[in-house]
Amino acid sequence: MNKKYVIVVFFLISILSSVLAQGGLKYRGFSGGMMIHTGYLKSNSFDLQTIQGNYITTSNVEGIPFGIGGSARLHFGKHLRVGGEGYVSNLRYGIQGTTASVSWGGVLADCVWELGRLWPFVGVVAGGGAMEHIILQDVPADDFVVENNVSYREYTFMALSPIVGVEYALSEKMHLTFKMDYVIKISNPQADFPSGPRFFLGFMFYRLDD
């Protein structure tokens, strides 16, 4: 894993540890909801070849993904939230309609500060997922004919994802949520894995004790 990513994750863990040391961890309730997302993702370059090993072209995954997912959290004390989240990001690129799909989920821990209606938060997710990549070299026709020059790849990975965001309390029970993340793959390195910032928007529903 890149050194700068290690520094970012270490910084987030330090914030979590510092906040935990400041107060109690009494259970306060829970929250959860759904979000849509987009962003900008890009992979390293990789070579495509025939079954015989002949070079075809060099390509890379790059573009604007769209996806959906959600999260659920248990609230402890004034700041700590622990739970889980999961998302699917789909990306189409190239004139042939090549598709890349990243499914990802894990254990979530973050810290939130209640500043009136604004609730900024920072945290990290640790988990894993799967990458599915269907590479087309010809524009597919709308028929039932099997296409030539198709590559299908699927693999799993482990990852960390630092997150930062803010919630706006529309009411005691519903918040408008915006956040940003960056999935950092820490196992099974692959040239076609797309990385980059993703931006999320959605609603979280709350049930907290006063």
PLM regions and their residue ranges:
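Cleavable N-terminal export/targeting peptides
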Residues: 1-28, 209-210
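Short glycine/proline- and aromatic-enriched beta-strand/turn motifs that initiate or cap beta-hairpins
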Residues: 21-75, 208-210
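Outer-envelope beta-barrel architecture signal
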Residues: 24-32, 78-80, 116-122, 156, ...
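Residues that define the transmembrane beta-barrel architecture of outer-membrane proteins
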Residues: 28-30, 62-68, 99-105, 118, ...
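Transmembrane beta-strands of outer-membrane beta-barrel proteins
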Residues: 31-39, 85-87, 121-127, 179-181
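Extracellular loop and loop/strand-boundary signature of outer-membrane beta-barrel proteins
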Residues: 52-58, 92-97, 146-152, 185-191
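Gram-negative (and chloroplast) outer-membrane scaffold detector with strong preference
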Residues: 74-146, 158, 168-170, 202-210
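Predominantly the C-terminal beta-signal and adjacent terminal strand-loop region
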Residues: 160, 167-210
